[in-house]
Structure formats: structure tokens, C-alpha cells
A protein has these predicted regions:
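C-terminal edge-of-domain segments
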Residues: 52-74
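Short, structured protein-protein interaction patches enriched in aromatics and acidic/basic residues
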Residues: 8-9, 33-55, 59
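N-terminal acidic leader/helix
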Residues: 2-25, 30
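Absolute protein N-terminus
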Residues: 1-2, 74
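Short, low-complexity, charged amphipathic interaction modules
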Residues: 26, 36-42, 61-63, 67-69
Length: 74
């Protein structure tokens, strides 16, 4: 199996697309299943054992909230 390269991408979604993805994530969390999402051409599998956190950042007039899912591939 080839090693995956480091990657840091951000994708902008419409409100309806974002809501749909959040809904699928919530459903996966409630049922204890892994979550699958494609981001910028790469399919990502988030395991049910992932850890979750919410970050709030402020810099000048800009604010940001990030919902993060973190895990280690085994």
C-alpha cells in the first residue's frame, strides 16, 4: 500500500450542500458507522472511533468556527 501524501485543503460548499453533509455526518455518528466524504477529488473515510472537537478562532474582524474530526489510521 502506498503512503498517502500530506494534504491541507479547504472546500467551499453551498448552504444546501453543507447541510446535507452535516446531516449525513450526524446520521453516521448516531448509528456508530464510519462517515465517507469526498473532498477535492479524494474520498476520505472517517472511522466511528474518531475524536471530535469544535474550535473558535478570532483575528481582528474575522471569526471562524471549525468542527474537527481527528483519528489515526491503523
Amino acid at each position: 500500500m502506498s503512503e498517502k501524501r500530506d494534504r491541507d485543503v479547504e472546500k467551499i460548499y453551498s448552504t444546501s450542500e453543507f447541510v446535507s453533509k452535516l446531516r449525513r455526518l450526524a446520521d453516521a455518528l448516531e448509528t456508530g458507522e464510519r462517515f465517507e466524504i469526498q473532498v477535492s477529488g479524494e474520498r476520505v473515510y472517517v472511522p466511528a472511533r474518531a475524536e471530535f472537537n469544535i474550535e473558535h478562532e478570532r483575528e481582528g474582524d474575522e471569526e471562524e468556527i471549525e468542527f474537527q474530526l481527528k483519528w489515526t489510521n491503523q
